[in-house]
A protein has these predicted regions:
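Beta-propeller-forming repeat regions
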Residues: 24-223
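N-terminal secretory signal peptides that target proteins for export/translocation
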Residues: 1-6
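Sec-dependent N-terminal signal peptides of Gram-positive bacterial secreted proteins and lipoproteins
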Residues: 7-28
Length: 223
């Protein structure tokens, strides 16, 4: 089992290095990057929900990295075929200024279902992955804590409200895949220790919980 985990970690590290070398991503024009999406007419009610958040003193704060950088994103989170709306805001007047609002479609309208709150300077990234293959996607949120640090949190919405499976672990990069071939997705997080040595943390499902299974020192530094 230990050898299988080590092989899985090496595979994930290879994937991370490949992505960093290839510069995997998308190219956008300045107009596409800085203009807000125009919602079609059928999303009028959603637009009203968004306006209520803006009128409360918030402003749009889209993720600054990765492929999902729109301030409002449509994603089927619960596997029912209907797309939830995920919207990103900052309200500087609040103790936790960074907000991720989740609106669910219901009877030709949208209702606020949940809010994820965080601290830091910005929302760094967002990814949607069904880690336990139950048909419902978890949210992997990167928070920019300061210019030198990012923190990764993983949230489940199974209960209707955000449940933090991984709580704000520092990271440089991460990858998800079914590394041990058990039908569930594992997570490998690359981070630096206090001496800036590279550490790979391996998270997997154990007894229904997403837990840190092991950590391994790697030769690369995390500068």
């Amino acid at each position: 089992m230990r050898q299988q985990i080590q092989r899985g970690i090496r595979a994930a590290l290879g994937l991370l290095l490949l992505l960093s070398v290839s510069g995997c991503g998308f190219t956008f024009s300045p107009e596409e990057l800085y203009s807000l999406p125009q919602l079609p007419a059928e999303y009028t009610e959603l637009n009203n929900c968004l306006n209520q958040v803006l009128e409360s003193g918030a402003e749009y704060a889209a993720p600054v990295s990765g492929s999902n950088i729109q301030p409002v994103q449509l994603e089927d989170l619960d596997g029912d075929g209907a797309q939830e709306a995920v919207a990103f805001f900052r309200n500087s007047a609040e103790e936790k200024p960074l907000k991720i609002y989740i609106f669910t479609p219901r009877n030709d309208t949208y209702e606020q279902a949940a809010v994820i709150e965080g601290t830091g300077t910005s929302i760094y990234s967002i990814a949607y992955e069904d880690l336990d293959q139950d048909g419902q996607k978890e949210l992997l949120v990167g928070w920019r804590v300061n210019t030198d640090m990012q923190a990764l949190s993983v949230y489940s919405l199974r209960s209707g409200q955000p449940e933090e499976l991984i709580q704000g672990t520092s990271y440089v990069r991460y990858a998800v895949n079914d590394l041990n071939q058990d039908g569930l997705w594992e997570l490998v997080v690359l981070r630096a220790d206090e001496e800036n040595n590279g550490i790979a943390d391996y998270y997997c499902w154990q007894e229904g919980e997403f837990q840190l299974r092991t950590s391994a020192r790697i030769t690369s530094t995390m500068a």
